[in-house]
Design a protein with these regions (language model features):
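Conserved alpha/beta enzyme-core scaffold
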Residues: 1-312
Length: 312
């Protein structure tokens, strides 16, 4: 018996009538290229999935499985914070991920690209418990190569699939239309974001509207205030309306288009550190910048981050 545990099984849109199919065919060809439909997903939609294959999904495309009891019962209600835990509970013994690649032969490097978190955590969990796990990387040359923490050596995996058939167009749905209501909500959201804060944006028109509103706030402050005042009959006291002098830190499981625009606009630029004590000192303003001063050393000493005074 095969149990597939995955986030989202995406298939190209199909028309339900001859007219719909004629309309969609050129659009689908342009947007999705040679993206292959997942056979198990097609069988699931048609209610023809073999009984020895079970699919558990922790995300589902809205409306795809209306009236499909088997697919609905296979849904796992979770979020990315707990995905690795909930996948391990399913008793998995193989993890496979599409990866980006750079170089050839001994110089080959792989990148878990835009979705590295789950695989790393699953591998760590299984290694800590001494449980067997076959790790498979499938190279897709069209995946974006993300560096730093997402970059790994091929030796991390037990199997690296280099079949050219695995290189295909990525699934990229068109952006949803941003409505006036979306923009209004985005403006309100942008007025709640503190300079020096942390930002998470999801997929969809609300995220796009919020990103645009943050850019307007930073670049066109007077216009931002004027529009916000028209939406707030009780005034904008207590709202965040100034430009981003310190910048924001972007923290999200999704690298959405709005994030890219905020990076290009210089708004997402705040650096953070993988040290809770050091980061708290920075957040509290006890360490102002990267210049090491006597005040910096005193703050580190008082916090226990430096364990003994330094002498000349």
């Amino acid at each position: 018996k095969l149990r597939i545990v995955t986030a989202l099984s995406l298939c190209k849109p199909q028309g339900h009538s001859e007219l719909e199919r004629h309309f969609l065919e050129p659009l689908v060809a342009r947007l999705f290229g040679d993206y292959p439909d997942l056979e198990y997903a097609l069988d699931s939609r048609a209610g023809k999935r073999p009984p020895n294959i079970e699919v558990r999904e922790f995300f589902m495309k809205t409306g795809d499985y209306l009236g499909n009891a088997a697919a609905q019962q296979g849904y796992i209600s979770t979020n990315y914070t707990f995905v690795a835990r909930d996948m391990a509970v399913q008793g998995m013994n193989v993890i496979a991920q599409a990866v980006a690649a750079r170089g050839e032969g001994e110089d080959l490097r792989l990148s878990l690209s835009s979705n590295p978190d789950v695989t790393f955590e699953v591998i760590e969990r299984y290694a800590a418990r001494g449980m067997p796990l076959l790790k498979v990387a499938v190279i897709n040359r069209k995946m974006p190569f993300m560096p730093n923490g997402a970059e790994v050596a091929p030796s991390m995996f037990d199997v690296v699939v280099t079949d050219p058939a695995a290189t295909h167009t990525l699934f990229g749905a068109p952006n949803s239309k941003v409505t006036p209501a979306d923009y209004a909500i985005g403006l309100h959201a942008a007025s709640l974001v503190e300079d020096g804060g942390t930002l998470q944006i999801g997929i969809g028109s609300l995220g796009d509207a919020s990103a645009q509103a943050l850019i307007v706030r930073d670049r066109h402050g007077a216009e931002f205030r004027r529009i916000l005042e028209s939406l707030c009959p009780d005034g904008i006291a207590g709202r965040e309306v100034d430009r981003f002098d310190r910048g924001l830190y972007g923290c999200s499981e999704m690298f959405v288009n709005g994030f890219l625009r905020l990076i290009e606009a210089g708004i997402i630029r705040r650096e953070v550190f993988g040290d809770a004590v050091l980061q708290q000192l920075i957040n509290d303003g006890r360490i102002a910048d990267e210049t090491v001063t006597a005040k910096t050393l005193r703050a580190l000493l008082d916090a226990g981050r430096v364990r003994s005074p330094l002498g000349a």
